[in-house]
Every structure is written in C-alpha cells, then in structure tokens.
Curated annotation (Swiss-Prot):
Name by which UniProt lists this protein: Small ribosomal subunit protein bS6
Role this protein plays: Binds together with bS18 to 16S ribosomal RNA.
Family in the record: Belongs to the bacterial ribosomal protein bS6 family.
Gene encoding the protein: rpsF
Keywords, alphabetical: Ribonucleoprotein, Ribosomal protein, RNA-binding, rRNA-binding
Lineage: Bacteria, Pseudomonadati, Campylobacterota, Epsilonproteobacteria, Campylobacterales
Gene Ontology terms: cellular component: cytosolic small ribosomal subunit
Length: 125
C-alpha cells in the first residue's frame, strides 16, 4: 500500500452538518475501497488565492491515508462528480524521504517555530 494525501475544498455555503456529511462521505469512499485513514486535518474556512467557480472562500480538509493504487482513480472520479467539492489535489509519497515526511505530518508532528518571548522592560511608574 502506498502513502497518499488528499486535500479538498468544499463550498463555503454549506452548513456545518453538510460539511460533516461530505467529509464522512469521502472517508467512506476511502475505507470501502481498502484505504487505511491515518489522520483527518480540518483546516477550516479560508480565503482562496483566486476565485474558483465564483467562490472566494472555501472549507479545507486534508486526509492522510494508505491505499492500493487502484483506489486513486475511484477517489478522483467521486471527487470530480461531487458538486460540493470545488477543488481537490491528491499527492503520492514515493521515496523514503517523502514517506518520512508523510509519517510526521500524519501524526501531527510539525516543525517547531521559535517561540517569541516578551521583552523584559522595566515598569514605568
């Protein structure tokens, strides 16, 4: 089984229940076809870089999963015909370096940023 990541953007006009239903639908398509879902990352509603199908915002989701290669064609077909999905991207991780990065991302380990510490300023009286 290969390592994959799918990012998809849902219409911003959907209610929270509809968004959850579409997320469950995509997860069901993956599991029915033999995928093992590692992590689902809801990224929230964000502004798009440019208008897509007359929308300026979208609700983003990323799913990290392992799957046989024949699943990808079915997933792509389902995402294309689902009206609520305005854009999607499927990424395949192939070499050891990419797979290591996939494992870090799928387990929620992110690169740590330097913490900004407040300056020690004297109190003003």
């Amino acid at each position: 089984m290969k390592h994959y990541e799918v990012l998809f953007i849902l219409k911003p006009t959907l209610t929270e229940e509809e968004v959850n239903a579409k997320l469950e639908f995509v997860k069901e398509v993956l599991t029915k076809n033999g995928a093992e879902i590692e992590t689902v990352v809801p990224m929230g509603t964000r502004k798009l870089a440019y208008k897509i199908k007359k929308y300026e915002r979208g609700t983003y989701f990323v799913i990290y999963f392992k799957a046989p290669t024949n699943l990808i064609a079915e997933l792509e077909r389902v995402l294309r015909i689902t009206e609520e999905v305005i854009r999607f991207l499927i990424v395949k991780y192939e070499n050891k370096k990419e797979i290591a990065a996939w494992e870090k991302l799928s387990h929620g380990i992110k690169q740590s940023k330097k913490e900004i510490k407040p300056l020690d300023a004297p109190e003003i009286q």
